[in-house]
């Protein structure tokens, strides 16, 4: 009753709504104007006019109305007879990317006028832009290469200008940017280098369009080792709840295609599809050995998981993981698979079943019956039941598993058609808890199409995906009813085809009608040309207008093949070759195409698979997506009144909805909408459901695009060569080039559409995946399929040896030869003799043997190095002809690749502790010769043969630093302050060489690269509040450091002149610093001061404030800035207090203040402080420097005067900077006094151009560069330098303009020995002698108490041979309350490596800020050390056995007071035992 009452109410509403139309549509003109709901600028659009039953001449106009005014789309159109006509128009580009405008349609005659205004969306046609990187994942320090591709919607190249392109790291820091990037022929290639320690995680490349739209591309940065092999897990896609066994196959294959020997562990876990730890209900594990094909198949019994019982409780699935452990190396890699659990053993897929039916037109159903694997099931009975139509039927599936039905819809009285398809028989299970076996069944519900006269048209299409450039035939079925048909002689059906939001095709079909018929039924075929412009989706609307004004229509969506007009092919000839050989690459494409080439090691893609660049990916780009626009207001058809809140009884589909789904809007006075105002939610129409799952899609084409069967087709094989290749001579392969990206290049194909390149194959034995992306002005984009190239040798040799040994130790060198040929090989293995080592074969006759097919063999030598330094080991494996058989086979050798040679370097180090002394002098000669003597002495305990020395000459004061800007100090760079020593000196070098006009492109490129890398690294240490600290924010728990933030601020501000620095980093740092300023103008300290020299002045606050003021002024802030002005007031007050308190204990603070006042232009205060400092200067040997009165005392017994400490170098350099910053220029007196300090500073330089630590290096190089620029002379002076011994050695160097920056060097032969250095001619030279040697570890009075033990202590435990624990105890015993930051450097025993996880755990301790692990040592960064003992321990394990193990050294030192150092040594618990080598 309720249903009938509601239906009557809706029908009554409909009748009322239609009363006004009755008089209008009897004899009056009928209009329908179809327009895309979304219009694009600068491209031809169409508006289609349909004027029917026209009884007067009318004028048609169309206008777009916006805030900028009214624009006519076309000239007035005068029509005097029935017409269907489409008019083209073009809209000019909008100032914004899109806007809603009003489209006004007017059709006006003498008697009648039709006018309607609707809202349309007008959009600028955006370019299609994407980014391609050379690979999806990068390691720290690698170069990221990428190309920007720009096309129009037709995929033709654009020369587009992008205002900005930039890189964002995981913290959204902009680390690199390019401005005004322009594509040429649609392509632009860019690159940038990652720092050695970047933030790891996802990065973004962002391309900003002129419209403001951003296109993004992601890549990953992380530390990783490329997988040598991949693991493929083969499992069924699905099983049924009735299955008891799952077959799991795991196969491991090297990247060069050969099977992996080893073991596999298979884990099968049951749970719901999320597989979180909470939803796993159980796992089973199986272990097995891989067979000769690298595979293992396991039958896993799954009855314990009770699938039938659990099916109703949760959606079940299995996750399978297989971990393969490679034999010999222990390397592990994994693969995984997933298995769905289904209720039945087979299921139905609906391939055809429309969402709506039409009374009087057959309803077509096509299903495919598939098994649990998705394979079709032929010759099986399929039954169908449609109770609403009184229809039942049965048929048998064909060879493709298909069953077809046609349901008569004449007898359907309801608004819905419910269909049930089942296999064999209907399920007897009524309740959901039934566990009896079920057969496949599926349900589908279709709803009626609305027509007042019960007239319909239906488009029937078979194809799933339409191929390009072909004719597609669409069958149209129609039935027309009603009295109005009696007056018709013919009826015309009109159709439109839409794609990419525009009307592409229109046409019509005329059907003749016999007079007096009350029902007309028939069908006809329409042929639709499939054009490229229709890719990827086309929509077709067909309609006709009946005499009474009723419109009947249907629409259909076509999936069009994602084809590209530019046919690109890439191939290699040959497609398999030896490493380092030549191969021929051929690319074909449309003539004059610009092609981007790429070839990547398959191992990279195994590590991180990426979406392959394909037509599907291109057509899925945002710029290629098409969407319908539905106005939010001003749509007369959308303004529906509310009705009663009940579930609608009808889900009928009307013409209005067909029009809207096609992407059109209709301006009309015809009947196109369902005559009811009841609130019907069309978007919730339920559709057919394959098996049990509910599918709510409304797309008819969905059934055609369902994946049915995944069939792997065999790859095409290369045709066999007709002629055998000629025999090559023995080609020896020496492999040392192992890139991850082999090819990344742009090439242009010639007028014939071909380009050919000769390529050198890298040395990696792997499979390379290559592809080409080409753009043509004529045919647009083209993509090649992936081409494979296999770099492979029939056999090759691998060496196993330690990273380094100490002289006197012995180790076993192993050479393993792997044969991947199906035949045995007579093999000869040779270790090249050398005077640098002795080698004894472990086995007799091991240099010649028969290597079996697909086998491996290891030859070993007991090696004892004799020389120090880098020792080369060269091992060759050669397949040689043999007259006799090889095993049971005839001896054969390969045609190519018969010899493989591998060269590896071993570092042989002397015993004891390394010592280095540097003797530097700035020598300036005039007319007379200038000379000085130098005695190179050695302590009596020097390690034999460890002494070496060299003499260097440079014509420029910064030559050494310029050459070694990334190695200025031989110390770790693991914190935010130390990183800046890699950054700031490059600024001073660039400024200096620029000012002196000595800057070359090579030096500039190198310095800019270092600046960019340092900039990236420093952002690792930034906090969210804009500050910086030594080790970053530690997940938000760390505190920003005031001093370091000021240092970074000034460095970034100065670097802006050379590289991109995101201004926000400078602003953030300044804002944070300003918040640390007190009312007095001084700055409060935040975070720990790693360098205690900052505490050596009046107090922390004044010294710190002087440093920050200096940093702000060096950042180009004026002294009138409020923050700077207040800071200077703080310094002025502090200086007055220092003056009143007397001199003597504030040297460091005064040096900083003098420079700060000089920068501020306060010459008076600068001069006062310099005068005070002059009284405290230490003047000796024609040099001037300053020292702290309370500096740490140095140990006695030094053979040479030790290098000055960091603080002394800093303060002396600050005095130089203060003198050279005099306004308007330094006086001759300033330069003369500075010269004395510069002489002292140069004597403190180390052999790399740096000083003892980081801050002194930065400040001193700043002072040296400014002094060098102030005194630089372009005169043609050519001094010569001679170094000679007291014996026969003599070497002369000439210094002139051409080699001024060149570092000239010679080794000194006599140590110990006396040498004389003489300079003649005119000019200054920088001379430096470096002496290095080793001494045994001796007992001393160190600044640190250091105790090192091993656990176990002795070799009682057999495990002590392979791994043991190192335990350290450290405390400070120096003259200060606490040290600065301390480094503990633990060197590894030869053949041992640290267990990284046990080292990284130490970072959880409060006093360990950072750890660094390499093959040869472990570094621990300690904030500071007091007299309280700190304890640490970690585990090391044996990698390569070594005999006669020597002790390893542990060094603990103050980072800023490097003379405060302690040494200890440790040995393996079993070092006294005979090792198995």
Curated annotation (Swiss-Prot):
Q: Name one GO cellular component term.
A: extracellular space
Chain spans, region Bait region (approximate): 601-750
What are the alphabetically sorted keywords of the record? Bait region, Disulfide bond, Glycoprotein, Protease inhibitor, Secreted, Serine protease inhibitor, Signal, Thioester bond
UniProt cross-references to SMART domains, sorted A to Z: A2M, A2M_N_2, A2M_recep, Thiol-ester_cl
| List of glycosylated residues | 55, 247, 301, 321, 393, 508, 750, 777, 872, 994, 1143, 1314, 1427
Which pairs are disulfide-linked? 48-86, 251-295, 269-283, 468-563, 595-774, 643-678, 850-886, 924-1324, 1082-1130, 1355-1470
Q: Which PROSITE patterns match?
A: ALPHA_2_MACROGLOBULIN (PS00477)
- Main localization is secreted
**Cross-link Isoglutamyl cysteine thioester (Cys-Gln) per UniProt, renumbered positions:** 975-978
Quaternary structure and interacting proteins, as annotated = Monomer.
> Function of this protein?
Protease inhibitor with a wide spectrum of protein targets, which attaches through its thioester function.
Family, per the entry?
Belongs to the protease inhibitor I39 (alpha-2-macroglobulin) family.
Q: What is this protein called?
A: Alpha-1-inhibitor 3
Natural source organism: Rattus norvegicus (Rat)
């Amino acid at each position: 009753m309720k249903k009938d009452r509601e239906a009557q109410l809706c029908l009554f509403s409909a009748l009322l709504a239609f009363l006004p139309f009755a008089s209008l549509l009897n004899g009056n003109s009928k209009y329908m104007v179809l327009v895309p709901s979304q219009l694009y600028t600068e491209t031809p659009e169409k508006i289609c006019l349909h004027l029917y039953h026209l009884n007067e001449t009318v004028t048609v106009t169309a206008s777009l109305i916006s805030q900028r005014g009214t624009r006519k789309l076309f000239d007035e159109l005068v029509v005097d007879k029935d017409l269907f006509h489409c008019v083209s128009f073009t809209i000019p580009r909008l100032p914004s990317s899109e806007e809603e405008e009003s489209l006004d349609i007017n059709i006006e005659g003498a008697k009648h006028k039709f006018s309607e205004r609707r809202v349309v969306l007008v959009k600028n046609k955006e370019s299609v832009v994407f980014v391609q990187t050379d690979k999806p994942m990068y390691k720290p320090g690698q170069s990221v290469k990428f190309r920007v591709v720009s096309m129009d919607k037709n995929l033709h190249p654009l020369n587009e200008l992008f205002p900005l392109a930039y890189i964002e790291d995981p913290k959204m820091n902009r680390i690199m940017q390019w401005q005004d990037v322009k594509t040429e022929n649609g392509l632009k290639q860019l690159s940038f280098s990652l720092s050695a320690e970047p933030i790891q995680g996802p990065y973004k490349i962002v391309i900003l369009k002129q419209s403001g739209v951003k296109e993004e591309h992601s890549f990953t940065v992380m530390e990783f080792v490329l997988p040598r092999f991949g693991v493929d897990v083969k499992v069924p896609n699905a099983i049924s709840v009735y299955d008891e066994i799952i077959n799991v196959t795991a196969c491991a294959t090297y990247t060069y295609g050969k099977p992996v020997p080893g073991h596999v562990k298979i884990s099968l876990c049951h749970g719901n599809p999320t597989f979180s730890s909470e939803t796993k209900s159980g796992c089973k594990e199986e272990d097995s050995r891989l067979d000769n094909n690298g595979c293992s198949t396991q039958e896993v019994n799954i009855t314990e998981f009770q699938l039938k019982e659990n099916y109703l409780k949760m959606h079940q699935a299995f996750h399978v993981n297989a971990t393969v452990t490679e034999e010999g190396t222990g390397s592990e890699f994994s693969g995984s698979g997933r298995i769905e659990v289904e209720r039945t053993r087979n299921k139905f897929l609906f391939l055809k079943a429309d969402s709506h039916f039409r009374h009087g037109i057959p309803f077509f159903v096509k299903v495919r019956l598939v098994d649990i694997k998705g394979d079709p099931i032929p010759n099986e009975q399929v039954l169908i039941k449609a109770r609403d139509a009184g229809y039942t039927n049965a048929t048998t599936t064909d060879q493709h598993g298909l069953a077809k039905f046609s349901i008569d819809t004449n007898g359907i009285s309801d608004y819905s058609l419910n269909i049930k398809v089942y296999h064999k028989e209907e399920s007897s299970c009524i309740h959901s808890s039934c566990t009896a076996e079920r057969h496949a069944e599926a349900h589908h519900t279709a709803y009626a199409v609305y027509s007042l006269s019960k007239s319909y048209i239906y488009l029937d299409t078979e194809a799933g995906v339409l191929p390009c450039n072909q004719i597609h035939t669409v069958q149209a079925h129609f039935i027309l009813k009603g009295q109005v048909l009696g007056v018709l002689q013919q009826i015309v059906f009109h159709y439109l085809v839409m794609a990419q939001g525009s009307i592409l095709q229109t046409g019509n079909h005329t059907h003749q009608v016999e007079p007096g018929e009350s029902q007309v039924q028939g069908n006809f075929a329409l042929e639709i040309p499939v054009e490229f412009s229709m890719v990827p989706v086309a929509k077709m609307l067909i309609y006709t207008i009946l005499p009474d004004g009723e419109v009947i229509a249907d629409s259909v969506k076509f999936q069009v093949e994602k084809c590209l007009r530019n046919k690109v092919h890439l191939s290699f000839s040959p497609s398999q070759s030896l490493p380092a050989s030549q191969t021929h690459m051929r690319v074909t494409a449309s003539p004059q195409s610009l092609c981007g080439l790429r070839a990547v090691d398959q191992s990279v893609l195994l590590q991180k698979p990426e979406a392959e660049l394909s037509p599907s990916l291109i057509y899925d780009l945002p710029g290629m997506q098409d969407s319908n626009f539905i106005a939010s207001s001003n749509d007369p058809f959308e303004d529906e009144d509310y009705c009663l809140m009940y579930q609608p009884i009808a889900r009928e589909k009307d013409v209005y909805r067909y029009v809207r789904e096609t992407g059109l809007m209709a301006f009309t006075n015809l009947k196109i909408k369902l005559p009811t105002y009841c609130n019907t939610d069309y978007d919730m129409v339920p559709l057919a459901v394959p098996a049990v799952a509910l599918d709510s899609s409304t797309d008819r084409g969905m059934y055609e695009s369902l994946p049915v069967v995944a069939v792997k087709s065999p790859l095409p094989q290369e045709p066999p060569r007709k002629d055998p290749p000629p025999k090559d001579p023995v080609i020896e392969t020496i492999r040392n080039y192992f890139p991850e990206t082999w090819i990344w290049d742009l090439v242009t194909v010639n007028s014939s559409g071909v380009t050919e390149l000769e390529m050198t194959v890298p040395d990696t034995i792997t499979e390379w995946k290559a592809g080409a992306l080409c753009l043509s002005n004529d045919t647009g984009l083209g993509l090649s399929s992936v081409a494979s190239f296999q770099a492979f040798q029939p056999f090759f040799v691998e060496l196993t040896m330690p990273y380094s040994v100490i002289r006197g130790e012995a180790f076993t060198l192993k050479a393993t030869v792997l044969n991947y040929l199906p035949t045995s090989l007579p093999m000869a293995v040779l270790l090249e003799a050398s005077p640098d080592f002795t080698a004894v074969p472990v086995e007799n006759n091991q240099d010649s043997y028969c290597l079996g097919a697909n086998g491996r063999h290891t030859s070993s030598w007991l090696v004892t190095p004799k020389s120090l330094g880098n020792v080369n080991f060269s091992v060759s494996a050669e397949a040689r002809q043999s007259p006799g058989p090889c095993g049971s086979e005839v001896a054969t050798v390969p045609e190519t690749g018969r010899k493989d040679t591998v060269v590896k370097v071993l570092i042989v180090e002397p015993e004891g502790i390394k010592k280095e002394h540097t003797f530097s002098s700035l020598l300036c000669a005039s007319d007379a010769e200038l000379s000085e003597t130098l005695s190179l002495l050695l302590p009596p305990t020097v390690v034999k043969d460890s002494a070496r020395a060299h003499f260097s000459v440079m014509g420029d004061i910064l030559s050494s630093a310029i050459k070694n800007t990334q190695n200025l100090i031989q110390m770790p760079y693991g914190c935010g302050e130390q990183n800046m020593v890699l950054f700031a000196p490059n600024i001073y070098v660039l400024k200096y060489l620029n000012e002196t006009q000595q800057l070359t492109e090579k030096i500039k490129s190198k310095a800019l690269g270092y600046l960019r890398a340092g900039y990236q690294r420093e952002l690792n240490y930034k906090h969210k509040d804009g500050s910086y600290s030594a080790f970053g924010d530690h997940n938000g728990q760390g505190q920003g450091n005031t001093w370091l933030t000021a240092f970074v601020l000034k460095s970034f501000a100065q670097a802006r002149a050379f590289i991109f620095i995101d201004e926000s980093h400078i602003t953030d740092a300044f804002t944070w610093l300003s918040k640390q300023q007190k009312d007095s103008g001084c700055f409060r300290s935040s975070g720990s001061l790693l360098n205690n020299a900052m505490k050596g002045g009046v107090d922390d606050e004044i010294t710190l404030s002087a440093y920050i003021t200096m940093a702000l002024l060096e950042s180009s802030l004026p002294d009138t800035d409020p923050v700077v002005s207040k800071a200077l007031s703080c310094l002025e007050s502090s200086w007055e207090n220092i003056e009143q308190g007397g001199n003597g204990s504030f040297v460091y603070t005064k040096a900083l203040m003098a420079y700060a006042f000089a920068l501020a232009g306060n010459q008076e205060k600068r001069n006062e402080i310099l005068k005070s400092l002059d009284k405290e200067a230490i003047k000796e040997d024609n040099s001037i420097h300053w020292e702290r009165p309370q500096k740490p005392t140095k140990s006695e017994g030094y053979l040479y005067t030790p290098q000055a400490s960091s603080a002394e170098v800093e303060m002396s350099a600050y005095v130089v900077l203060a003198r050279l910053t005099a306004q308007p220029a330094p006086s001759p007196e300033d330069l003369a006094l500075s010269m004395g300090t510069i002489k002292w500073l140069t004597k403190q330089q180390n052999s790399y151009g740096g000083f003892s630590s980081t801050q002194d290096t930065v400040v001193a190089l700043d002072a040296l560069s400014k002094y060098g620029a102030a005194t630089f002379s372009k005169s043609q002076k050519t001094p010569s330098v001679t170094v000679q011994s007291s014996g026969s050695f003599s070497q002369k160097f000439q210094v002139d303009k051409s080699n001024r920056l060149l570092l000239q060097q010679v080794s000194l032969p006599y140590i110990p020995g006396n040498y004389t250095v003489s300079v003649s001619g005119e000019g200054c030279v920088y001379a430096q002698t470096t002496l290095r040697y080793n001494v045994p570890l001796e007992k001393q009075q160190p600044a640190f108490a250091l105790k090192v033990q091993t656990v176990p202590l002795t070799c009682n435990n057999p495990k002590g041979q392979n791994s043991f624990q190192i335990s350290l105890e450290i405390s400070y015993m120096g003259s200060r309350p606490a040290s600065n930051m301390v480094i503990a450097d633990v060197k590894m025993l030869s053949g041992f490596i640290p267990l990284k996880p046990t080292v990284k755990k130490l970072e959880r301790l409060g006093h360990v800020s950072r750890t660094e692990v390499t093959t040869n040592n472990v570094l621990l960064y300690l904030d500071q050390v007091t007299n309280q003992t700190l304890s640490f321990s970690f585990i090391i394990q044996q990698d390569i056995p070594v005999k006669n193990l020597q002790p390893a050294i542990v060094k603990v030192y103050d980072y800023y007071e490097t003379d405060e150092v302690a040494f200890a040594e440790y040995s393996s618990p079993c070092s006294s035992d005979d090792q198995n080598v």
